[in-house]
């Protein structure tokens, strides 16, 4: 049987991992064995955090809406309930934007929610 020499393939694999680890600190960017572990871990964090990002943004939007609603004399849950009863279909992302950048429009939405609750 012919001898299989894998130098080219191994070099390519190592280069690929070291390229992905570029910018990492110390041995994590220079030593293949350490860089491989760092790249695998980074991938796990990236996968997890892509899912967490969605949760964190929703939390941020809710916190902003709650703060703005309370300034207008209504709690978050009652405000959302009022909007649903008034059949206003604006998602939390847009509501948070309105709360931050257009306080007059947000106050009008709060009044609409209050009217629907009464």
UniProtKB/Swiss-Prot annotation:
<dbReference type="GO" id="GO:0019843">
    <property type="term" value="F:rRNA binding"/>
</dbReference>
<dbReference type="InterPro" id="IPR035566">
    <property type="entry name" value="Ribosomal_protein_bL20_C"/>
</dbReference>
<comment type="function">
    <text>Binds directly to 23S ribosomal RNA and is necessary for the in vitro assembly process of the 50S ribosomal subunit. It is not involved in the protein synthesizing functions of that subunit.</text>
</comment>
<keyword id="KW-0687">Ribonucleoprotein</keyword>
<keyword id="KW-0689">Ribosomal protein</keyword>
<dbReference type="GO" id="GO:0000027">
    <property type="term" value="P:ribosomal large subunit assembly"/>
</dbReference>
<dbReference type="GO" id="GO:0003735">
    <property type="term" value="F:structural constituent of ribosome"/>
</dbReference>
<dbReference type="InterPro" id="IPR049946">
    <property type="entry name" value="RIBOSOMAL_L20_CS"/>
</dbReference>
<dbReference type="GO" id="GO:1990904">
    <property type="term" value="C:ribonucleoprotein complex"/>
</dbReference>
<dbReference type="Pfam" id="PF00453">
    <property type="entry name" value="Ribosomal_L20"/>
</dbReference>
<comment type="similarity">
    <text>Belongs to the bacterial ribosomal protein bL20 family.</text>
</comment>
<dbReference type="GO" id="GO:0005840">
    <property type="term" value="C:ribosome"/>
</dbReference>
<keyword id="KW-0699">rRNA-binding</keyword>
<dbReference type="GO" id="GO:0006412">
    <property type="term" value="P:translation"/>
</dbReference>
<keyword id="KW-0694">RNA-binding</keyword>
<protein>
    <recommendedName>
        <fullName>Large ribosomal subunit protein bL20</fullName>
    </recommendedName>
</protein>
<dbReference type="InterPro" id="IPR005813">
    <property type="entry name" value="Ribosomal_bL20"/>
</dbReference>
